[in-house]
Swiss-Prot record:
Purpose: Promotes absorption of the essential vitamin cobalamin (Cbl) in the ileum. After interaction with CUBN, the CBLIF-cobalamin complex is internalized via receptor-mediated endocytosis.
Pfam annotation, one family: Cobalamin_bind
Residues modified by glycosylation: 311, 330, 413
Encoding gene per record: Cblif
Keywords assigned: Cobalt, Cobalt transport, Disulfide bond, Glycoprotein, Ion transport, Phosphoprotein, Secreted, Signal, Transport
Family to which the UniProt record says this protein belongs: Belongs to the eukaryotic cobalamin transport proteins family.
Domain of life: Eukaryota
Binding-site residues, cob(II)alamin: 171, 222, 270, 365-370, 386-395
Main location: secreted
GO MF terms held by the record: cargo receptor ligand activity; cobalamin binding; molecular carrier activity
Protein name per Swiss-Prot or TrEMBL: Cobalamin binding intrinsic factor
Record bears the keyword Signal: yes
InterPro entries linked to this entry: Cbl-bd_prot, Cobalamin_Transport
Amino acid sequence: MAWLTLYLLSVLWAVAGTSTRAQSSCSVPPDQQPWVDGLQALMENSVTDSDFPNPSILIAMNLAGAYNVEAQKLLTYQLMASDSADLTSGQLALTVMALTSSCRDPGSKVSTLLKKMENWSPSSPGAESSAFYGPGLAILALCQKSSEATLPIAVRFAKTLMMEPSPFNVDTGAVATLALTCMYNKIPVGSQENYRDLFGQALKAIVEKISLRIKADGIIGDIYSTGLAMQALSVTPEQPTKKWDCEKTMHTILNEIKQGKFQNPMSIAQILPSLKGKTYLDVPQVTCGPDHEVPPTLTDYPTPVPTSVSNITVIYTINNQLRGVDLLFNVTIEVSVKSGSVLLAVLEEAQRKNSMFKFETTMTSWGLIVSSINNIAENVNHKTYWEFLSGKTPLDEGVAYYIPFNHEHITANFTQY
């Protein structure tokens, strides 16, 4: 009688609680608000008609209250015109939420996303944690548009997550928390099949794992996963055993902003909602008013202190030891660049000095990624890519944003995920 249960539930969805009230939240102190305004302006000003339309940026703009109305309109029109067939489930989900937050009807994009997810299952029993990121976004977007139709998919997703033994990923855990919290909130209390219990159990397991990644300074995972994690921990109905100190996290994030760590528009898009006291669960509640937003004056925007203009030396290694790849190599070069230069400048100088260091880049929503070095290119089918490390630690910023320090050893390692 599963169909009858779904029918009865569908009658009750409309009266189910839809509140997105934060369970644990904190706010930016008034004297620190100019830093957030400057961050938002940087993100909004990155939008041009030649860029890959990034739905995450439009969601952040709408949740925060856009200053640059022209950029907001441009992104909206670009996303409305995007071809759903060319998008992954995660990209399509973000597009649906972006258009919803713009008070635009996503149209057939919702039904296309639902079809993509109806037959969803992990690619393999031991699938990487990141394989759940896109489906998590899809369930979140579908929950906000048609929660009753999403229920069977969300149930399968929750059960799979609880059985999944693969290493935990904070970004994926945060998205899964938002998705299942949406479903949990939509189901009427006392409904059959114990769906709330299932989602509650899954949420408890996920937030416990997220809490284990909270560092002493409040950062959750790393500074770039903290934004989504803050959203998740602020709305989940199942709080972790280890209490989260939101104020400490906010304090550290604001300090990182002052150090210029958030320069990538995508990284800003993920942290901005939390800085504004919003989460992705607020997307359906965005009010679209007249185009009268006025940005703070430019004098309100603090900027990080400029760095020295002296030169630094960076040690740069390219390495490929993967079996099955024709060309194996491990080559190191020292290059000199101006202090404060981004890693991309190091790659360009190395390429100028030695043709073995020739590289190619691809534009993504996160900015430039290095797709090929020394004629060895990433391959989705083989799950290979170029990973950049400082010493033995993977970089958490892209080549167009990471700033090396003097005598730092950067390695580009061809590896698999």
